Amino acid sequence: METTVKFEKNSFKNRLQSMLRVDFRRMFKTKYFYIIVACALVIPILITVMMSMMDGSVSVNPQTGVETIMEGPENTWQSIGTLPTANGEAMGGMDVMGMCNINMMFMAVAVFVCLFITDDFRSGYAKNLFTVRAKKGEYVISKTVMGFVCGAMLLVAYFVGTILGGAISGLSFDLCGLTTGNLVMCMLAKILLMLVFVPIFVLISVAAKQKAWLALCGSLGGGMLLFMMVPMITPLGSTIMNVGLCCIGGLLFTIGLGAISNRVLKKTSLV
């Protein structure tokens, strides 16, 4: 009696699924992932509560004697974006709440992606991975997907923290003429916009290899070049058009920069 042994074909799909499982398992076992998510949850609570407590306080410049009155947030959603007011002015434009808001998470995800990828090269994991089974293109795809999921979780955590901070401070949840649909579209647009930023961070990280400081400096510097476009593309009054633009832009950046990252890995040393 003959026994036939069939070997499962190690296709692109199987290799990618295997790498994604390993990367997500490693991500959820990494301490700094939970630290970054915890920071994303706590930061909006601290900022909202502290700014609310300082509302109306007066500080005097000792040199000029000029008094400055601190203005706290008037609305919970100022941590998400700029709200329209009755007189047509923006609520939360260039003040503290306008600068220290949910858009900071686009820079926070850079920290995680850089540390995760540079650790692969520093520990020798990436070199062993490419030697045994994985292809460099699959590595780039896996790291991009992982970074996107991490970025989405950071945005959701910040959103939850914003609601908690507003509730603790007793701020208004009024959308000032906007709708819940606009708020949902705003969050979806921001999540999809992560597909623009994450490939940039992946590219810089694979180029920096084991040099975490270089990856962080390059990613934060490169991200800042596009950072100012975030509130314009994903305003609080976002519509399906904003979501579509972020989706198309994200796909173009993911494909284009992913191909460049793959090329960089093929043409450079792994150490």
What are these regions (language model features)?
Residues 113-132:
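Transmembrane helix boundary and interhelical loop/hinge segments in multi-pass membrane proteins
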Residues 2-7, 23-27, 251-271:
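Junction motif at the cytosolic side of a transmembrane helix
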Residues 42-48, 220-231:
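Aromatic-anchored segments of alpha-helical transmembrane domains
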Residues 235-246, 267-271:
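Membrane-interfacial helix-loop-helix junctions in multi-pass membrane proteins
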Residues 15, 135-136:
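Short coil/turn motifs that cap or connect alpha-helices
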Residues 7-9, 33, 37-116, 141-208, ...:
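Secretory targeting signals
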Residues 2-41:
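Aromatic- and glycine-rich beta-strand/loop motifs that create alpha-glucan
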